[in-house]
Amino acid sequence: MPPAISAFQAAYIGIEVLIALVSVPGNVLVIWAVKVNQALRDATFCFIVSLAVADVAVGALVIPLAILINIGPRTYFHTCLMVACPVLILTQSSILALLAIAVDRYLRVKIPLRYKTVVTPRRAAVAIAGCWILSFVVGLTPLFGWNRLGEAQRAWAANGSGGEPVIKCEFEKVISMEYMVYFNFFVWVLPPLLLMVLIYLEVFYLIRRQLGKKVSASSGDPQKYYGKELKIAKSLALILFLFALSWLPLHILNCITLFCPSCRKPSILMYIAIFLTHGNSAMNPIVYAFRIQKFRVTFLKIWNDHFRCQPTPPVDEDPPEEAPHD
């Protein structure tokens, strides 16, 4: 018999389904926009596609698995562990994609004349592949042994049972808090976030310094170039801010769990933290639509062409912005 679902669980499931219904179509639209608009094909937008793929997977895979875990089925330990690992992989992929985006924007303003020779499509593809490979290594580490199998086996043996332990599948019953705090948070989440903050501060400093310079007749219109860079940098920094705002509460709660085992964590706080992490996947397409004109125009074209059956003229694909001369 499947476990009965309480009214609270039903509300939780309803909110999760709503988040998924916003996240999946929104991020598919982001990927679609990059596919149809040549002006969205530079390295930054390739990294944005990688981020969108992770967000689609959150809505299509992680949220259904989170609902399953919330219902609390009894499973073999390693089955539950495999259910818990995808969220770790996708979170790490998002962080590394955001870091790649930050580095890309830094290079655009630091070496505008050499940017296209340094950041080639091939190198961008290699960076994206590297981010995903590293994400799988970090996210699957619990499967390689850093988990709570020993505790589960002792409890299982104490009941006089043999074989692989069967447990009520919950995240904290299979994932070690030492892994979540010392390895995941202190190594793979917090340092990249702090590094990205420093990178964006440097990006804004470089752009402001360039915009403050006097324009000469042969400068290649740096005001226009750096003005566009400033707008895009602000939008991408907002994406980073929302990511940090969404994920830090859950990691802080994990720290409390590890360092203060006797401290009570109200269930409502855990649910809010989980909603924030999943909801972050639905936020990015909204930011793109309101903050980045190329995305907004392409979204409207896709809507008119494929959903309203009112074909519109081709998207005005701006030529690549000419880098200013030194």
From Swiss-Prot:
Coiled coil: none annotated. One of its GO terms (biological process) is mucus secretion. Gene3D superfamilies: Rhodopsin 7-helix transmembrane proteins (1.20.1070.10). It comes from the Eukaryota. SUPFAM superfamilies: Family A G protein-coupled receptor-like. It is found in: Cell membrane. A lipid is attached at residue 309 (S-palmitoyl cysteine). Residues 34-46, 103-123, 202-235, 293-326 are cytoplasmic. Glycans are attached at residue 159. GO terms for molecular function: G protein-coupled adenosine receptor activity. Residues 1-10, 70-80, 147-176, 260-267 are extracellular. It is a multi-pass membrane protein. Disulfide bonds join 80-169. One of its GO terms (cellular component) is plasma membrane. Belongs to the G-protein coupled receptor 1 family. This is Adenosine receptor A1. It comes from Canis lupus familiaris. The gene is ADORA1.
